[in-house]
């Protein structure tokens, strides 16, 4: 009974730390959120979940996470560098000119294999900095096979969204990519733009197997589309990005597949201190426009 109570107390303590971190995200942005998640790690997770155990349980973070402790460890290890990379690529593709005019826009954002929605948070951070969103409607579609991670993603997007004036809705899908494409291919409503975010997923073999079906889906969504993909400098990731680019039709290449790097301040779990480190990645940005079925029929007639 004593051991059980201690375990329950430890779980509650982690949950409180994560809730505090989410509040920091809402109040101050991603950097403070990351610092608070590192605080959760050093408060005790480093003892209960050392890196070697985490790497074994998650196949070095390649399989879906199963606990909040694993999510905290993942964020401590990779969250800041992943955010900085995606944030850098969004700014490079979409530009750094501030848009102060209050225009009306509806935007769908699909975050595939979203994890803790790092890509969506980076997009929200960009919008907060550069775009007047008071007349925006943002529809987030978060696709993630881990329920634990998906719940955290919904919380974080909710918190970060409160920093901008847009009307935001969040649609969570506790599914892998294959199931999402089979069962939910009709979910996106009418929008001025649909953004498709891929952060550290196109190097995964199971995702690459779905690229033909994924491209059919991307071409079925009406209107203007943008694909932003970022991942590690692994051979599998180059393969996944090139496969996606070559499988899509009539695209405008905003950013071809290319290496890049950013500097991040991260916490080293192996050395137990903060450090500045260059984070290396591969990026790609594509745009295309799909004609509606009704328009195609009218044109053919």
Question: For the regions a protein language model found, what residue spans apply to each?
Answer:
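Domain-level detector for long C-terminal conserved domains
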Residues: 2-26, 149, 155-161, 171-301
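Conserved SAM/SAH-binding beta-strand->alpha-helix loop
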Residues: 146
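N-terminal auxiliary segments of SAM/dcSAM-dependent transferases
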Residues: 1-57
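Conserved class I S-adenosyl-L-methionine
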Residues: 105-115
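Active-site catalytic pocket residues across diverse enzymes, especially alpha/beta-hydrolases
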Residues: 93, 97, 127-131, 157-161, ...
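Conserved SAM-binding loop of SAM-dependent methyltransferases across substrates and taxa
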Residues: 116-133
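Class I SAM-dependent methyltransferase Rossmann-like catalytic core
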Residues: 60-100
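Short beta-strand element of Class I
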Residues: 138-141
